[in-house]
Amino acid sequence: MENNSFNWLQDWYYSQCDSEWEHSYGIQIETLDNPGWIIAIDLLETELEDREFQEISVKRSDNDWISCLVKNGKFQGAGGSLNLLEILDIFRKWVEAENSLKKES
């Protein structure tokens, strides 16, 4: 990806902040004890809240896996210890794909 996905996520979060959204919604990144990562990104009251997302589940090994879905108004991603950027890249590609479709319309 062209830019660092952490920087991109920071920019996406900032673009959602409107003096209201950030008081009820946000982004959570936590560790799992198996070990791994879990990410929850609130989509309610964003342009993404009604967008369809095709669930992704890949298990390469016990330590190299990802699972991403949208449920209850949240993008939810989980993965192994070294899969955090892969999860962020999946979210980013989904957002950017939707944005490019809007530009073409």
Question: Model-predicted segments: where are they?
Answer:
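Eukaryotic low-complexity, non-globular regulatory regions
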Residues: 3-6, 10-20, 83, 99-105
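Amphipathic, interaction-prone secondary-structure segments
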Residues: 17-56
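Helix-rich interaction surfaces within compact, conserved domain-sized segments
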Residues: 56-104
